Amino acid sequence: MDLPGLIHDFLLVFLGLGLILGGLGVVLLPNPIYSAFSLGLVFVCISLFYILSNSHFVAAAQLLIYVGAINVLIIFAVMFINGSEYSKDFHLWTVGDGITSVVCTSLFVSLITTIPDTSWYGIIWTTKANQIIEQDLISNSQQIGIHLSTDFFLPFEFISIILLVALIGAIAVARQ
């Protein structure tokens, strides 16, 4: 989306705050229904980020797959869980929460200090448009594949990491 700089920056900050608040809601809200709706907010904000970066196909796929399927499935599964077991024995803060907070905060600080010092020349070099062959000689699905492996490589990898974490979490919950 081609927006003036000030409006674009405002929308980025607004969506970033939505992501942060939604992520905190997923983790901190004791009711699983509210956590699932917060996860839906996170997915919608990510989709809007993709729209701001002019990747409309990835935004549509994000909305259809994550909000339309995964989040609805999570809400449907949570509806069958007995809600009374979550309300009893609720402790505001435990030792595990403290350890997790320290680990997440240290990881966040290390990322914040590492990312500005990283040379992104190699990543920018692989996403140059002149490396892509003639656009007229390939089909639309091949163009999507080329863009996913060049221009949208990092978002594609982030999505695969999120799916891996969700799979590991589902296995851990199923084993208990």
From Swiss-Prot:
Enzyme Commission no: 7.1.1.-
Transmembrane segments: 10-30, 32-52, 61-81, 92-112, 152-172
Known catalytic reactions: a plastoquinone + NADH + (n+1) H(+)(in) = a plastoquinol + NAD(+) + n H(+)(out); a plastoquinone + NADPH + (n+1) H(+)(in) = a plastoquinol + NADP(+) + n H(+)(out)
GO MF term list: NADH dehydrogenase (ubiquinone) activity; quinone binding
Pfam families, alphabetized: Oxidored_q3
Keyword Translocase: yes
Primary location recorded for the protein, binned into one broad class: plastid
Function: NDH shuttles electrons from NAD(P)H:plastoquinone, via FMN and iron-sulfur (Fe-S) centers, to quinones in the photosynthetic chain and possibly in a chloroplast respiratory chain. The immediate electron acceptor for the enzyme in this species is believed to be plastoquinone. Couples the redox reaction to proton translocation, and thus conserves the redox energy in a proton gradient.
Protein name: NAD(P)H-quinone oxidoreductase subunit 6, chloroplastic
Organism: Lactuca sativa
